[in-house]
Regions:
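Short, solvent-exposed loop/turn segments at secondary-structure junctions
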Residues: 13-15, 48-50, 98-102, 149-150, ...
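Conserved nucleotide-sugar donor-interacting segment of glycosyltransferase catalytic cores
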Residues: 118-186
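Hydrophobic anchor at the start of a short beta-strand
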Residues: 39-41, 92, 140, 172
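Single conserved hydrophobic/aromatic residue that forms the stacking wall/gate
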Residues: 1-8, 12
């Protein structure tokens, strides 16, 4: 069996918080099944502006407040929100920053054009999720990364967290999806 007692699953889309598609339904089903098997699962995703905080009962994690993420020369506030998955004993941590995730769209604008700062949003999400796990002191055995927006997590862990006792023994699984991403990141 691949999963041990602690698994952190990082994903970009998760039902019921965003409209259902291949990634959201797959990540939710996998996380629930793993959690139901007795493993500890933590799900991380961006707190996109389309997510209704009231309906999904998101609330800020005060003990994690005051954290910042540095990207290039920008020192950006990191806000962590949490909600419970309906019908499961599992929490979803939302990585939030007004500049990157307040928009009412996920990756593209109303005309379908990619946001020019998707690369910085990807960095912020990846670093924010890693920093959050480190501050929680929660040592994952497996980190399952889903989709392109969390695809920098393995590289970041290898380059900057290789000796960190929280992450050094973690195994990484990457799941890629054909979700219509067109274009590139700078």
């Amino acid at each position: 069996h691949l999963y041990h007692r602690r698994q952190r699953q990082m994903c970009i889309r998760d039902s019921p918080y965003l409209p259902e598609n291949t990634i959201s339904s797959t990540t939710l089903a996998l996380a629930k099944k793993t959690n139901d098997s007795g493993h500890q699962v933590r799900v991380f995703m961006p707190r996109f502006g389309v997510i209704n905080e009231r309906r999904h009962q998101l609330h800020e994690v005060i003990r994690l407040s005051g954290m910042n993420v540095v990207i290039n020369d920008m020192d950006l506030p990191l806000i962590i929100k949490v909600a419970s998955v309906p019908g499961a004993r599992m929490q979803v941590y939302f990585i939030d920053n007004e500049e990157f995730f307040k928009r009412k769209f996920t990756y593209t604008d109303a005309e379908g054009a990619q946001f020019e700062d998707n690369d910085e949003r990807t960095l912020f999400f990846s670093k924010g999720a890693i920093d959050t796990v480190e501050k929680l002191g929660w040592k994952p055995d497996i980190i399952h990364v889903h989709g392109w927006m969390s695809s920098l997590v393995p590289m970041y862990l290898k380059l900057f967290q290789a000796d960190n006792p929280i992450f050094k023994d973690a195994k990484i699984v990457f799941s890629a999806y054909d979700n219509g991403f067109e274009g590139g990141l700078s």
